[in-house]
Amino acid sequence: MNKIISNKIINNNIIFRNNFNNLFFIRNFINNKNNNNNNNNNNNNNNNNNNRNKKLKYSPNHQWIKISENKDFATIGITNYVSDIVNNEFNKILKIKLPKINDKIRLNQPFLSIWTKEEENIQFKSPLSGIVSKVNNKFNNQQTTTISTKTTTTTTKIKPKLPLKSNSLFFNNDQDSWTIELKINEPFQTNHLMTEEEYAHYCENTDYK
């Protein structure tokens, strides 16, 4: 993981900027690349594309979004790209805080806060508006473990970590990687969200094919 990414955290509310911050440029680049590939290779399909989750969208602040088929719920999680950075490049995560069930969340409202020793508060902004219907409590605060012997009882704090399932940029939609579920109660647009291919270029992942 590129260590200079951590230096791109700007202020305390803007997270993980990178050089590919112009989504219009990325989409034009991908369209041109795909057109060239189609012209040169009409009969060759990339098998990897068949295995990718076309239903997931990605936000500029490194969250994945899965919208239900009837479009009334959205599950939101953190991608491996940013999870790996936070886990490996910050010495200590002090606290992780999520909203409560029934909280109203607006588009671009900070809803997930991570306090670290180096950065006072890293915040993730919501990619959609809605009402919190579920919360993944595995993200909330520190946990403790207690070990008892015949003579002593020791309570140890477990260092909080963001879930990381693979070396991929992307999270699978599993029980550990999601943060909240939103009940969507108003019309919404997804033009500001990225496909997997767009997100890979946004993260400057040259290995994506």
UniProtKB/Swiss-Prot annotation:
<feature type="region of interest" description="Disordered">
    <location>
        <begin position="35"/>
        <end position="56"/>
    </location>
</feature>
<dbReference type="GO" id="GO:0005739">
    <property type="term" value="C:mitochondrion"/>
</dbReference>
<dbReference type="InterPro" id="IPR000089">
    <property type="entry name" value="Biotin_lipoyl"/>
</dbReference>
<dbReference type="GO" id="GO:0005960">
    <property type="term" value="C:glycine cleavage complex"/>
</dbReference>
<comment type="similarity">
    <text>Belongs to the GcvH family.</text>
</comment>
<feature type="domain" description="Lipoyl-binding">
    <location>
        <begin position="73"/>
        <end position="159"/>
    </location>
</feature>
<dbReference type="InterPro" id="IPR033753">
    <property type="entry name" value="GCV_H/Fam206"/>
</dbReference>
<dbReference type="Pfam" id="PF01597">
    <property type="entry name" value="GCV_H"/>
</dbReference>
<dbReference type="InterPro" id="IPR011053">
    <property type="entry name" value="Single_hybrid_motif"/>
</dbReference>
<feature type="compositionally biased region" description="Low complexity">
    <location>
        <begin position="35"/>
        <end position="51"/>
    </location>
</feature>
<protein>
    <recommendedName>
        <fullName>Glycine cleavage system H-like protein gcvH4</fullName>
    </recommendedName>
</protein>
<dbReference type="GO" id="GO:0019464">
    <property type="term" value="P:glycine decarboxylation via glycine cleavage system"/>
</dbReference>
<dbReference type="InterPro" id="IPR002930">
    <property type="entry name" value="GCV_H"/>
</dbReference>
